[in-house]
Amino acid sequence: MGKIKIGINGFGRIGRLVARVALQSEDVELVAVNDPFITTEYMTYMFKYDTVHGQWKHHEVKVKDSKTLIFGTKEVAVFGCRNPEEIPWAAAGAEYVVESTGVFTDKDKAAAHLKGGAKKVVISAPSKDAPMFVVGVNEKEYKSDVNIVSNASCTTNCLAPLAKVINDRFGIVEGLMTTVHAITATQKTVDGPSMKDWRGGRAASFNIIPSSTGAAKAVGKVLPALNGKLTGMAFRVPTVDVSVVDLTVRLEKPASYDQIKAAIKEEAEGKLKGILGYVEEDLVSTDFQGDSRSSIFDAKAGIALSDTFVKLVSWYDNEWGYSTRVIDLIRHMHSTN
C-alpha cells in the first residue's frame, strides 16, 4: 500500500504541527500546503523555528521557488488560494485535506476542497454539522462514504477518552468540566477589541480569563450516552502550551478513588494505549510538552469527596497531541476506505 497523501489548508499553529507529524510518519506523505497570507520563504522560517516545540532538526527545509518547498529531498507544492474551490489538490496528488484555517468549519464550506480534487476533508476544529470523531472513542463509527469529518477540539480529545472509561466502568450521572487552557492565537497580547467576548479581549499574558467552551457538550456528540450529562467552561491562563482538564462527576456505581485509578490505568495500558496516559509522579504542565497522547490522567491530582462524587484531572499538549490525532484519524479513514 502506498503512502497516504495529504494537503494542508492554513499553515498556522495546527497546520504547521500537523506537517511536522506527517513528515515524521513513515506512512504519510505531505504533498501540498495552501496559505494565501504567507510566502514560501516565511513559511519555511515559521516551520523551522517554533517557540514552543523547538527547531526542526529532522532534515533540511528550503525554498525551491515561489510554489515549491523542499523537505529533505521531498518537494511539496505551495499554493496561495483564498478560495478553497480553487486549490488544485488533485494536481498535487493530495487525497486527504486537513482544513486548519479555522474559517471553513462547516460541511458546506469545507466541501469546497472536494471541488479541487480532494477525496476527504478533516476539519481540525469542532464543526456544527460535520460528524465529529475522537480517536480512541468513536472513530470506528466512521463510514467510508463520509467525505467531510471533524477531529473535534483538543479539549474534547482530552475529555472524551477519560469520560468514556469512567462511564463504561462506573456510569456518569452528570458532570462539570473546567479546562485550564494555555493561550491560543485568537487572544490579545495587550487589551484590545473583542466584541463577542469582552473578557477575551484582555491581555493574554497578564490575566486568568474565564471563557466559554463547547468541549464538554461535544462529548455528547461522540458519546451519545453522555448527551446532556456534561457541560463546562474554560480559564485561559498565561502559559503558551499544555492545558489540563478538571472533570468532576457524580457516579452511578459507587467506587473508591483507588478503584477509579486502577480502571483508568488498565485502559491506558490496554485498549487506549497511546491515547490515554496515566501518571503518578509529581508533574507540572511543561512536563507534558511534546506528549503525543490525547489525555494523561494525573492520579495524584484528583480527589474524591465520596464514593459517588469525584474530581479527575487529566493533562494534554493542546497543540502536539491534537495534531498527532489529526494524522491518526486520517490513517483510520484510509484503512476504512
Swiss-Prot record:
Keywords: Cytoplasm, Glycolysis, NAD, Oxidoreductase. The active site is at C154. D-glyceraldehyde 3-phosphate binds at S153, C154, T155, T184, T213, G214, R236. Pfam families: Gp_dh_C (PF02800), Gp_dh_N (PF00044). NAD(+) binds at R13, I14, D35, R82, N318. Plants contain two types of GAPDH: cytosolic forms which participate in glycolysis and chloroplast forms which participate in photosynthesis. All the forms are encoded by distinct genes. This is Glyceraldehyde-3-phosphate dehydrogenase 3, cytosolic. It comes from Oryza sativa subsp. japonica (Rice). The gene is GAPC3.
